Amino acid sequence: MSARRSANFVNTSVTTHELVEFEVPAGIAIGQAMRELNLPNKGDDAIVCAKDTEGQLKDLSHVPEETATFTAVPANSEDGRAVIRHSCAHVLAQAVQAEFPGTKLGIGPAIENGFYYDFDVAEPFTPEDLKTIEKRMKKIIKTGQKFERRVYESTEAAAAELADEPYKLELIQDKGNVDPDSDEATEVGAGELTAYDNVNPRTNEVEWSDLCRGPHIPTTRYIPAFALTRSSAAYWRGDQTNAGLQRIYGTAWESKEKLDEYQTMLAEAEKRDHRRLGTELDLFSFPDEIGSGLPVFHPNGAIVRLEMEEHSRRRHIQAGYSFVNTPHATKSDLFEKSGHLGFYKEGMFPPLQLDAEYDAEGNQTKPGQDYYLKPMNCPMHNLIFDSRGRSYRELPLRLFEFGTVYRYEKSGVVHGLTRARGFTQDDAHIYCTEDQLEEELTSVLEFIISLLKDYGLDDFYLELSTKDPKKFVGDDEIWERSTEILQRVATNSGLDLVPDPEGAAFYGPKISVQAKDAIGRTWQMSTVQLDFNLPERFELEYTSPDGSKQRPIMIHRALFGSIERFFGVLLEHYAGAFPAWLAPHQVVGIPVAEDFIPHLEKVVDKLRARGFRAEVDTSDDRMQKKIRTHTTGKIPFMLLAGGRDVEADAVSFRFLDGTQVNGVPVDEAVELISTWILERNNTQPSEETIAALR
C-alpha cells in the first residue's frame, strides 16, 4: 500500500489507547487502518469500534468516503463496554430463539453495567432456562460469528423480511418518530434502516439477523466475559396497556476479572438492598392497601428521617434560606401557566374533578375544575415570590421547603425508596440578579458538598449539562454566559467535571453532583439547575437600584433529590448500620443478669436526660442472645453490666465489630457517647476509636 493511502496517527503523544486519534484514508476500512497502526485487537484494551469527529460510533468495518479522523474506542472504555453489551444482547436473542422456537423479539439495548432483551414467549423464563440460554450463548460466542451491517433497500423490504416479528414491524412503522434518547432508538433511530447479520465465519452463512442501528463489535470473540443476571416481566415499550413480555438482563465486561469484580459488587449490593434492610430493621414498608411506590415509615425509620431533616433544616437556616410550606394539590391553571401540563402531563397523577355545585334535584349549577397533585414545588414558590413587590435589596431570595410531590411512575420502574410515586423533596428555589449569579452558584455548590459530607458521603464528581440546540428557550447569549459561569464554578470547586453535551432541560443548563457510595456505586445526588423559562412565564420582577423592573434569574436546587431516595442511598451506603447520630436506637443496656438492670437503668436515665435514644433490654433472653439481637439490629453502643461493673460504678462497651472495652466509669461512658453522637461521627465506634477518645 502506498504511503499516501496509509493510516496515520493524528495524536502520537497519547499514553492510552482510549485517546488515540488516527486518520483513515478514503476507501479503507477503519479496522484495516487500525491494524496498520498495530492498535490492539485482544485484551482489555482491544479496539472494538471508533468514534468520528461528530461523536458518532462506527463499526471497524466502516469505510469512509473521504479521508477522516477517528478516535479508537477500547473495550475498557464506557463506549467500548456499551458496544460489547449491545452485541451480547444480540447473542442473547439469537440463543433464545434457538432454544425457544417461535419467540418474538422486542428490543435489546445496552444499559448501565449491562444489557437486556425483551421477548414475547409462551411461559416466563425460569432460572434453569437462563442456564440453558447462557450455555447456548457461550457456544455462539466460541464460533466467532461476525457482525455484518446491512442496509435495507426500503421500508417495505425491511417489513417483508420481518413479517413474523410484530414488534419489529411496529418500530419500522414508527421510524422517524422515535425519541432519540429511548431504548427503541437502538433499533430505528436516525439515518438508514439497517440490520446486523450474525455470520458464520466458516460457511459465511447468515445464522441470525436483527433490526439494529449498531454499531457492533467485529466478532463474538470480542465478548470475553458475560453473565445473565435475572429475568422479569416487562411491557412492550414500557406501557402497561401494551403486551406483556419477558425481559432477560445480563452483564458483559472486557475481562473475566472485571466481570468477577462486578459480580462481587452485585452480591454486596444485594446484601445492602435498602428494601430488604428496611424490612429487617423495621424502618419502612409499602403496604398493598396504599399502593405501589407510596412508602410508609415505621417508628424506627421515622426517627432516622427526622434526624436527617432536622440537621438539614439547621444548616439551611444558617445558610440564609427562608422556609415555606405549600399544599399538595392545586388547580390545573397553575400547571398550565408553568408549562408542566404541556411537558410533564404523562408523569402526573390524573386530575381530580372538584368544586362542581348542584341544586336539590342533582342538576349541575356550576361546573367543576381540575385539580392536580403537584409533581414539583417550583410553581408555588414562584407565587410566593410574586405575592408582593420585590426589591433588589431582598435578593438573593432563597426559598426552601420539604415539599411532598407526586409523580406517576410506571410500575416497572418503581424501585423501593429510590424511585417512588410520592416523595418529599428538600427543594430550594433561589431568585437572584445576573450580577449575583456566580457568587450564588459557588455558595450553593459549596453548601451541597458540605452538607452531603455531614451525612458521610465524601467522593464526588460533577456533571455539566449544556444546551440542546434543538430544544431550548431563552436567549443564546444568556445560555452561553450562564453555561460559562456554571463551568467556571464547577472547575473552581476542584472536583472532576464530566461534560453532558446537549443534556440540559429546555429551560436552562445544570450541574449534577454525583456521589460514590461505600461499594463504589455512583448515585446522582443533587442538581443545580438554572431556569430562564419560569420567571418569564410567571412575569416575575424585582425593582432594580434605578427603579426599573427586572427579571430575576431562578435557580432550582434539590440537595438530596428526595428525602426518601437519600434515605435509601444512606441505608445501602452504611449497610443498615447508621452512624450513631442517625441510628434509631443509639444505646442499649444489656445486663449480665436481672440483678444488674437497676444499674443500667441509671446509666440510661443519664443518657436520656441529654436527649439520646437509650433503653435497657429487660427481656428474658440470655445475655449472649441479647448481644446477637442488638448486633443484628445495628445498635452502635451496647453497654454491658455485671457484678464488677456495679461495684466500680462502671459499664463495659460492646461494639458491632465484636470488640469490647471493659470497666469504663459511668460518667466517662456517658461523656464518650455524648461526644461521639454530638460530633456526628459517621464511622462506627469500636475498641480502637473509643480508646482514642479516652
Swiss-Prot record:
Molecular-function GO terms, alphabetical: ATP binding; metal ion binding; threonine-tRNA ligase activity; tRNA binding
Renumbered residue ranges of the record's region Catalytic: 273-579
EC main group: ligase
Residue stretches making up the TGS domain: 8-74
Major localisation: cytoplasm
Keywords: Aminoacyl-tRNA synthetase, ATP-binding, Cytoplasm, Ligase, Metal-binding, Nucleotide-binding, Protein biosynthesis, RNA-binding, tRNA-binding, Zinc
Bound cofactor: record note: Binds 1 zinc ion per subunit.
InterPro entries xrefs: aa-tRNA-synt_IIb (IPR002314), aa-tRNA-synth_II (IPR006195), aa-tRNA-synth_II/BPL/LPL (IPR045864), Anticodon-bd (IPR004154), Anticodon-bd_dom_sf (IPR036621), TGS (IPR004095), Thr-tRNA-ligase_IIa (IPR002320), Thr/Ala-tRNA-synth_IIc_edit (IPR018163)
Any single GO BP term: threonyl-tRNA aminoacylation
SUPFAM superfamilies, per the entry: Class II aaRS ABD-related, Class II aaRS and biotin synthetases, ThrRS/AlaRS common domain
Obligatory cofactor(s): Zn(2+)
Swiss-Prot/TrEMBL catalytic activity: tRNA(Thr) + L-threonine + ATP = L-threonyl-tRNA(Thr) + AMP + diphosphate + H(+)
UniProt keyword Magnesium present: no
EC number: 6.1.1.3
Record-linked Gene3D superfamilies: 3.30.54.20, Anticodon-binding domain (3.40.50.800), Bira Bifunctional Protein, Domain 2 (3.30.930.10), Threonyl-trna Synthetase, Chain A, domain 2 (3.30.980.10)
Subunit structure: Homodimer.
Record-given protein name: Threonine--tRNA ligase
Annotated source species: Corynebacterium efficiens (strain DSM 44549 / YS-314 / AJ 12310 / JCM 11189 / NBRC 100395)
Gene: thrS
